[in-house]
Curated annotation (Swiss-Prot):
Gene that encodes it: mnmG
Keyword Cytoplasm attached: yes
Principal localisation: cytoplasm
Function, in words: NAD-binding protein involved in the addition of a carboxymethylaminomethyl (cmnm) group at the wobble position (U34) of certain tRNAs, forming tRNA-cmnm(5)s(2)U34.
Subunit-structure text: Homodimer. Heterotetramer of two MnmE and two MnmG subunits.
Key words of the record: Cytoplasm, FAD, Flavoprotein, NAD, tRNA processing
Gene3D superfamilies cross-referenced by the UniProt entry: FAD/NAD(P)-binding domain (3.50.50.60), GidA associated domain, C-terminal subdomain (1.10.150.570), tRNA uridine 5-carboxymethylaminomethyl modification enzyme MnmG/GidA (1.10.10.1800)
PROSITE patterns: GIDA_1, GIDA_2
Subcellular compartments: Cytoplasm
NAD keyword on record: yes
HAMAP family: MnmG_GidA
Binding site for FAD: G13, G14, G15, H16, A17, G18
Biological processes, Gene Ontology terms: tRNA methylation; tRNA wobble uridine modification
Protein known as: tRNA uridine 5-carboxymethylaminomethyl modification enzyme MnmG
Amino acid sequence: MQFHERFDVIVVGGGHAGTEAALASARMGSKTLLLTHNIDTLGQMSCNPAIGGIGKGHLVKEIDALGGAMAVATDFAGIQFRTLNSSKGPAVRATRAQADRALYRHKIQEILQHQANLRIFQQAVDDLVVENGKVVGVVTQMGLAFEAPAVVLTAGTFLGGKIHIGLENYSGGRAGDPPAIALAHRLRELPIRVGRLKTGTPPRIDANTIDFSQMTEQKGDDPLPVMSFIGDVNDHPEQVSCHITHTNERTHDIIRGGLDRSPMYSGIIEGIGPRYCPSIEDKVNRFADKTSHQIFIEPEGLNTTEIYPNGISTSLPFDVQLNLVRSIKGMENAEIMRPGYAIEYDYFDPRDLKNSLETKTIAGLFFAGQINGTTGYEEAGAQGLLAGMNASLQVQGKEAWCPRRDQAYLGVLVDDLSTLGTKEPYRMFTSRAEYRLLLREDNADLRLTEKGRELGLVDDNRWALFSEKMESIETELQRLRGQWVHPNSPLVEALNPHLNTPITREATFEDLLRRPEMDYPKLMSIDGFGPSLEDQRAAEQVQIQVKYSGYIQRQQGEIDKAIRHETTLLPLDLDYQEVPGLSNEVIAKMNEHKPETIGQASRISGMTPAAISILLVHLKKRGLLRKSA
């Protein structure tokens, strides 16, 4: 049965990748269909009730700078906000919010339902329609066929999903949801490499059975951070505390005693789990010398008693879960509301993707989220936005776009995946970026919003606010550079007590702000140096740009040098056997990874500078040297 309308872009899946993909495509004017197995779970936070963190918060800010929904929804749902690494430099500071699951889901659904050009339809997808190497539509569970020249798959953990609790297992996409078995079988027929990964979640605890007085309270920040560049602290709901407790030797003995019934340690689970979010049984086994592990006791919302004990993800049998929970301080009488579990699922080798997230073998088919081997809401949302945007660009006959590694963490994420692939769930860290001094949370809008506007992702309201902020920053920087103070000036009497050494020569206000002991609020508080900018985010940007200008210029020089050949394209039909001087090892690596640019090739493990030089000489001789857009 054929659906009565044709669409430009179809998005399959309504998680964090799917919602951002659908919204991006629709914002750009493409007639978009979002297909989900359950409209009520659109925007569902399947695992931990939190958004942001180190590296992840940077991605959220980038999604926001490109007009995405994640940060906006977090501001309306965040019940505790903290700035991590606040005592360190701005490059590694990160915003993290504890979120009310229901409020977050409702806000995402509200944004989806009010988005022009977007249709939502509830049906699971069982089949892709591919003709002559190009996707032309999908077929749902009930046999309903939808046509579109571009399809974005964001299936999360649903592809061949299998849930494990102890030695028992059953098919599922997540607890309470069916898996996508037919679609998984169909995708395995495609010429794309497939593997299995694993992730897990902890048991949920009833707050009424926890003694919080035995734990350490962890409050949010004051003043409260805001996640979105267009957000307001007044959007935040009621704020609550989290708590901290620890496992102990008794907990570890209980876990060790249950390992013979662990699906991980009995060989039942084949998939590889996330290195940076291991299960508690994995932590106890791998770090046998540690006598305790920290657990964050996180509320799941304002109107629920469910607690998420972050740090004890497990797939041990229920009786072992209950005993280990009750061995922890403050949880001696705890009751489990939902058992923890592990889930195995299919993922596809991201090296088979272009950096637009379109598959290399099937035109018009895009993958985003956990299907590409990543873990985390933020990584999924960022990929979803990029895939939805590029699907829309393709339908409009325009060239694909992906930020470079020096432009965005999103660029780092996609380049890592499409060049190197992954054999374990990939998560973002600031350490993955070579140019993190330039890729800060605070300047994500300065880096990306103008490009987002050009692409059609950024609406008039966001653009007006951004333009106003940019004007404020530029005007204030010009003022600081143009105002001078002389050692004999009347201003010096009020200024010198704030300086480590009195000024002995004429200096601009910018020179004074650059001093280590001075900051923008302090300088503006001194008579004659104000007025200060009212917009605190613009004021922060002024301070950072002045304080770090030397380091930023140095890093920009490094980028300019590296970028000279970064975007030099490698022809897709280039036969590396015909390139004189390449070793068999390099030829094998190039054929395996199929890099699109010299930059991607240079990051393949084992690739030598000599091999890159040989490639460049070959391209030049053949007249094939050209850059990507």
